[in-house]
Amino acid sequence: MERIKELRNLMSQSRTREILTKTTVDHMAIIKKYTSGRQEKNPSLRMKWMMAMKYPITADKRITEMIPERNEQGQTLWSKINDAGSDRVMVSPLAVTWWNRNGPMTSTVHYPKIYKTYFEKVERLKHGTFGPVHFRNQVKIRRRVDINPGHADLSAKEAQDVIMEVVFPNEVGARILTSESQLMVTKEKKEELQDCKISPLMVAYMLERELVRKTRFLPVAGGTSSVYIEVLHLTQGTCWEQMYTPGGEVRNDDVDQSLIIAARNIVRRAAVSADPLASLLEMCHSTQIGGTRMVDILRQNPTEEQAVDICKAAMGLRISSSFSFGGFTFKRTSGSSVKREEEVLTGNLQTLKIRVHEGYEEFTMVGKRATAILRKETRRLIQLIVSGRDEQSIAEAIIVAMVFSQEDCMIKAVRGDLNFVNRANQRLNPMHQLLRHFQKDAKVLFQNWGIEHIDNVMGMIGILPDMTPSTEMSMRGIRVSKMGVDEYSSAERVVVSIDRFLRVRDQRGNVLLSPEEVSETQGTEKLTITYSSSMMWEINGPESVLVNTYQWIIRNWETVKIQWSQNPTMLYNKLEFEPFQSLVPKAIRGQYSGFVRTLFQQMRDVLGTFDTTQIIKLLPFAAAPPKQSRMQFSSLTVNVRGSGMRILVRGNSPVFNYNKTTKRLTVLGKDAGTLTEDPDEGTAGVESAVLRGFLILGKEDRRYGPALSINELSNLAKGEKANVLIGQGDVVLVMKRKRDSSILTDSQTATKRIRMAIN
């Protein structure tokens, strides 16, 4: 107060006012501060001061020929005095108004194309709906978010090359446009920008907005996709939020969302196959999302989600060094630990072997709906500060932290046996066993944890075992905070390794991710996901498996045919037949396979018995490990449409219908493709039918007269021998069997003989 009086007193003296207003500022430090460097030190003051002058703008000399010296009101638009230190003209702000009203009109056709991101934003806002404003405490946490809707996902370097190629095509400098997306964008933009008059620099700047993902680390309470982030300032303050529904979607958000769904489906599917890593890679390489190859998206898209990161790790890409447990992302912020195997007893006296982390560590835990700070010692939780959207979310975080702490009271709280399995029916590791157990029911865990009196700390309250808040008591070491915990800000990526069971480890051997961490949430993808891999056929149910399997055989018939005759085992082991096995009743799979393989062997042995349709029809059944049995089948069962349906070994059925005239195959009424048949197949079927019941003795033997035709064979008596002409023009000696034995024994004996006979 005294100081203010003193200043008032000074100002009342006219001399003071004169000194302050008239004296030049010549203090070196001040001059230095305001004149060194190109950076404006006080932009708003500078702007106000400039605009108060008569001619604050400078322009190229040509402007004097394009703008009159005075406007209609007689106000001067530009000064005849040149700008000091340059040969530009000093111009009044009124000149801008004149130009906007009377200046030349140019074509506006390029504006929506160049300023595409702005035009689209206006559309989204126009069609968006703003709801009521709610006043409540906002739990915001800083997350890395995409602030630039509607962009492609090129890297900065790739975008730079595209921009140079589009905007300055004639500039020198090595530019190699390699990726599909680069070439596509370049072609499209060059066409759009023909005869464009907008300044190249502006075009370059706008192109950058369109091609590169820009992320910022911002405090967010609600949706994190870019169409929400662009209105962040309108939808959430410190103590209020406004409901908002975007008036449109942008491809980059759709790509992120669809990528997560595709990755989850692929990881879940790979986890149950014989070789998860090989299957995962095969699926990533053969999948397209919205017409773009998934592997290209993975290389460019920075989305961090468990399944996406497993796919990236499999491709040898770097991923974030944080690890995942129970759906929370853990990042160690201080401390260190060594791992040691230890055997512990559950409350049910079951022995578990757990890897204990010894040492003091601090972590941040970030989940979708809750965040926390965790401090722990060896098998002891020291402190957990949680914040979350609701009671349920807070409870989830507490369970995960309690299990992660490996405390004895948590292990002793287990009631009953732990025998959770993953999708491939393998037992989960002990930590995930415990997690699943308590996620199902945490009552005993919370009751046994112990409670303590708490001090009154600003912004923090206690939480009781029944999840009710309290200011007096709380579960031991656990507090609920009003403030969220920020996501880990660094975008640092580390080299990781992945084993065949899709467990991802950092270079120290710590497990960062495993298929158990992949969310089971199902969603509907915004962009079309095309899985070309046979492993994903079953995603649309059994019918799709059936149709796809037969389509695949028909598409690849030429190679399949050769393998069928030369290397059947390799053919039976093909990945493409794996999904089909789930349709065949488990109990009889082996017998079917044995039967079909023997039938095929017989076709190979008895010349001329090659029957394309039958091979195609029965081939998928031969893929299961065969059981030797004497069983013969006239039809094979597959489980589709909720019941067993029959495929006839000889002849058509609703499941497998081959039309000889049109050569079209329909499976369950769906078109499965056209067969290009072998020319000599017409008669082959007849011959094979007759040759059954005959024993092949060897090469042609002239003593038994001229070769008979197939039809004449039927006149032979049992035990009688004759030469016979078979399909491929070979003549062999046969004997009519003395007794009617099974087709199968027929072919087994014929095997060696026919080869000898022909060769």
From Swiss-Prot:
InterPro entries: Flu_PB2_2nd, Flu_PB2_6th, Flu_PB2_C, Flu_PB2_CAP-bd, Flu_PB2_middle, Flu_PB2_N, INV_PB2, PB2_helical. GO terms for cellular component: host cell mitochondrion; host cell nucleus; virion component. Keywords: Cap snatching, Eukaryotic host gene expression shutoff by virus, Eukaryotic host transcription shutoff by virus, Host gene expression shutoff by virus, Host mitochondrion, Host nucleus, Host-virus interaction, Inhibition of host innate immune response by virus, Inhibition of host MAVS by virus, Inhibition of host RLR pathway by virus, Inhibition of host RNA polymerase II by virus, mRNA capping, mRNA processing, Viral immunoevasion, Viral transcription, Virion. It is found in: Virion; Host nucleus; Host mitochondrion. A motif (Nuclear localization signal) lies at residues 736-739. The record marks 627 as: Mammalian adaptation. One of its GO terms (biological process) is symbiont-mediated suppression of host mRNA transcription via inhibition of RNA polymerase II activity. Plays an essential role in transcription initiation and cap-stealing mechanism, in which cellular capped pre-mRNAs are used to generate primers for viral transcription. Recognizes and binds the 7-methylguanosine-containing cap of the target pre-RNA which is subsequently cleaved after 10-13 nucleotides by the viral protein PA. Plays a role in the initiation of the viral genome replication and modulates the activity of the ribonucleoprotein (RNP) complex. HAMAP family: INV_PB2 (MF_04062). Influenza RNA polymerase is composed of three subunits: PB1, PB2 and PA. Interacts (via N-terminus) with PB1 (via C-terminus). Interacts with nucleoprotein NP (via N-terminus). Interacts (via N-terminus) with host MAVS (via N-terminus); this interaction inhibits host innate immune response. This is Polymerase basic protein 2. It comes from Influenza A virus (strain A/Malaysia:Malaya/302/1954 H1N1). The gene is PB2.
